[in-house]
Amino acid sequence: ACTSQQAPKLKEGEKPVDVAAVVRQKMPASVKDREAWAQAIAKTFDSQKLAPTEENVCSVLAVAQQESNYQADPAVPGLNKIAWQEIDRRAEKMHIPVFLVHTALKITSPNGKSYSERLDNVKTEKQLSAIFDDFIGMVPMGQKLFGSLNPVHTGGPMQVSIAFAQQHTDGYPWKMDGTVRQEVFSLRGGLWFGTYHLLNYPANYSVPLYRFADFNAGWYASRNAAFQNAVVKATGVKLALDGDLIRYDSDEPGTTELAVRRLAG
């Protein structure tokens, strides 16, 4: 491997802080369960062996504020319409009459309400994920529309990718009662996996801004974009500074690789 998977350590001259104390100090007093946040983030830093600096703690809080306004299960405006549109889109893609799907959704779900009723009143991604889990697991139509893939891809207070969480469970300090997906929607799980994605990889960035960009675009996207910029200057070839050095949808070389080949002659 080109890099170790060790998290960044304390820089020279940096002083370790009491993570829980910094969380209590920096979070707005209006936030519910500040103590639960403080304990979850402190345990996250300890179990992932992250450098306990004010900058790192504040970086986690900044992402949580940006993504959820410090809510473990944030409400998403218009989520019910989004959910219905996704179901109708899948039905049309599979050439299943929409009215048949809507009829199937009128049956009673495991919580006693119909799937339609739950979808009409859904407010959060956690609720929507649970509806799809039930629908896929209980109703043949659900398997036909979605296979085994729940279409809710992110969750929790930091809106971390569920696929990312499923690939990075080593060292998780709490006992999981359910699935990794369900754990992401908990306060502790959302913070643990979100912090892992934000901080738990070595990157010699000068400012936290680049880690924030990586959080949205993928690990090392900022570094890769800087490399692309250097290639542009060296070759004069225009490239999208998107951080994607290779094509993931094809064996064909991407634009960045083709530009680098020009440098090599």
Annotate the PLM regions.
Residues 2-265:
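Cell-wall glycan-active module
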